[in-house]
Amino acid sequence: KRDYKTVSEWKKAYRDKAKLMNERGYRELQPKEFYRAIFPEGSLQSREHDGKGNIIATQIRPSGKGRTKQWVIDDSLNMLDKVIGDSFGLIPPLSFYGKTHTKENAHQLFAMAIDIDYVGLQQLKNMLKQFGNGVQLCPTFLVSSGKGVHLYYLLKEPVELYANREKLLSALKEDFIRRHWNDTSSIRPDN
């Protein structure tokens, strides 16, 4: 097994994965199109006090490069422009009440997102084969994230994030991770 160590090796691996996905018919989406699919129009707050949550996007800065910032993104998705193209940003498939990304403020879950690290070209080929032959549940979206991939499974309806559902949803996500992150999907399986 190959363990990529340099930034240039990972960038090449990223380009190779993008080429493979394109060859296999996976269409690249623009960021606003992707997030609109996750958060359908009307599902987020469009005016104050309408009872809907917002996206909380987080930009994480490398040490010494400024402060971490959070952006509140409403149903217009206009503030997405602040984080698109950032080298390390997080936008979970959740809506939140308030202006901070905390468990207490989480309102609705729109998709299950699974992060699999250290996915090289061969591991991506393995995953695509498993999705195609039904061994693994095919995600709605497959996102290349540099050193890995994110698998997004859109929910038919958003799930309200009540405290009594936390254990069940956490267990479901852990089951997805254990099933998908293995010695055929990652250079470094999650043991």
Where are the language model's segments positioned?
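Helical (often loop-to-helix) elements that flank the catalytic cores of nucleotide-handling enzymes
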Residues: 123-134, 155-183
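DNA replication initiation on ssDNA origins
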Residues: 1-111, 121, 127
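Histidine-centered divalent-metal-coordination microenvironment in nucleic-acid enzymes
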Residues: 114, 137-164, 191
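Anionic group-transfer/hydrolysis microenvironments
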Residues: 117
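Catalytic micro-motifs at enzyme active sites that drive phosphoryl/nucleotidyl and oxygen chemistry
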Residues: 97-104, 128-146, 182-187
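Chromatin/DNA-recognition segments of nuclear transcriptional regulators
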Residues: 172, 187-191
